[in-house]
């Protein structure tokens, strides 16, 4: 998606509400573009940083964060619905907090959005989401908004735990699978969302094993021990809890261990007329043709 203002000028993603020059509302529109598939080389790029002896360490740290390697689990949630939807998959780095699960949130660009194309309220919500930026800063500062669907997701660790499914303005399609499970007690964004829509808040991690603990206005994101988590109670967080939860999910065909990267493909379509041309042409049927190397 690309950010435009009313005069059809391309603007930066950080200009998420109004263009600083014209004052016009910024919207995000889908646009066919060309990309270099650098995400395919995420691990190679990450390992290559180790050979850059003369680079400042802070620059290498920035590059590592940009590539954003993470370890987690792809979890499958069964869905109750009157639509032809059987399950929803989501990637998470914290499967150990599943017993604190109180909602499932989808990007408005998620494939399941096609089932709501005729819903006028959803289309209004989707248009509103297009005004939200895609940077971490703009998402963090924006009001958390949701569109409640008629879907109900089932917790894979407890079949009796059923929660609502929302489309939400803070979920992006280009990270993970465009779906996140909400654990309000241990993620501030999820907590803000849960309070806005009066959703259940169940803490499942406490800093000390034998002391009472509760969540008020701030999510707890530190280390500790699992509780309110049935057979996972007492596991040390995160050193034991994540591994043990993934082992259980894999053993019962409920999830798969996964390595993920934040690095996106490199968009090269925004070319000036004096820049290097993209070596592609189109035939009379608008089909792309690669320009032979000997013609470049």
What kind of feature is each model-predicted range?
Residues 38-70, 101, 107-146, 295-296:
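Amphipathic alpha-helical
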Residues 91-93:
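Auxiliary tRNA-acceptor-end handling modules of aminoacyl-tRNA synthetases
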Residues 67-71, 95-97, 142-148, 154-157, ...:
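A short catalytic or substrate-binding loop motif that flags glycine-/basic-rich loops and adjacent residues
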Residues 110-208, 213-214, 218-219:
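Catalytic alpha/beta core of large soluble enzyme barrels
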Residues 95-115, 272-287:
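Structured, non-catalytic alpha/beta "coupling" segments that mediate domain-domain communication
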Residues 2-6:
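Short, exposed "boundary/linker" segments that immediately precede the start
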Residues 1, 13-14, 18-88, 179-295:
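Residue patterns forming the tRNA-binding/recognition surfaces of aminoacyl-tRNA synthetases
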